[in-house]
Amino acid sequence: MATRFRQTRRRRGHVSMGYGRIGKHRKQRGGRGNAGGQHHRKTWFTTFHPDYFGKHGMRVFHLKANKYYCPSINVDSLWSLVGKDVQAQYKNAKVGEEVPVIDCVKHGYFKVLGKGFLPKQPVIVRARYFSEKAQQKIKAVGGACELTA
């Protein structure tokens, strides 16, 4: 925005010309930036940035995430993931009709194992891994096994 007068003309008569009465447009004697955080600006740092100084733990470079982490669930526990109301809703479902989908990965299980028995009710099971027995038992009741990433 263009103005008629320069700032110096407008500020005539004001002692400090907008630069404050103490510093009077002189250098930074307190230091620049975050200088003095543990000395003359300690109260400001402890109030607004209490965790700025000091150690904050360490990263553990030699430990890797467990690449073999694979929580599993057995076939006889599959229906417990969706609840009894869903099982009752699809009680009389036939093969080819709409059947419930049980997503094991969403519930925290990656692998489905074959222990136990499934109710004679078709179901679609999604998991990362299936044992052979689990696949056989799910397909025996008219269900399907879907692999997910």
UniProtKB/Swiss-Prot annotation:
Region Disordered, residue ranges: 21-40
Keywords: Cytoplasm, Endoplasmic reticulum, Ribonucleoprotein, Ribosomal protein
GO biological process: translation
Predominant localisation class: cytoplasm
CC per GO annotation: cytosolic large ribosomal subunit; endoplasmic reticulum
Compartments it resides in: Cytoplasm, Cytosol; Cytoplasm; Endoplasmic reticulum
Transmembrane spans: none
Classification via InterPro entries: Ribosomal_uL15, Ribosomal_uL15/eL18, Ribosomal_uL15/eL18_sf, Ribosomal_uL15_CS
An example Gene Ontology molecular-function term: structural constituent of ribosome
UniProt-listed SUPFAM superfamilies: Ribosomal proteins L15p and L18e
A matching Pfam family: Ribosomal_L27A
Similarity annotation: Belongs to the universal ribosomal protein uL15 family.
Quaternary organization: Component of the large ribosomal subunit.
Role according to the record: Component of the large ribosomal subunit. The ribosome is a large ribonucleoprotein complex responsible for the synthesis of proteins in the cell.
Name recorded for this polypeptide: Large ribosomal subunit protein uL15B/uL15D
Organism, as annotated: Entamoeba histolytica (strain ATCC 30459 / HM-1:IMSS / ABRM)
Encoding gene per record: rpl27a-2
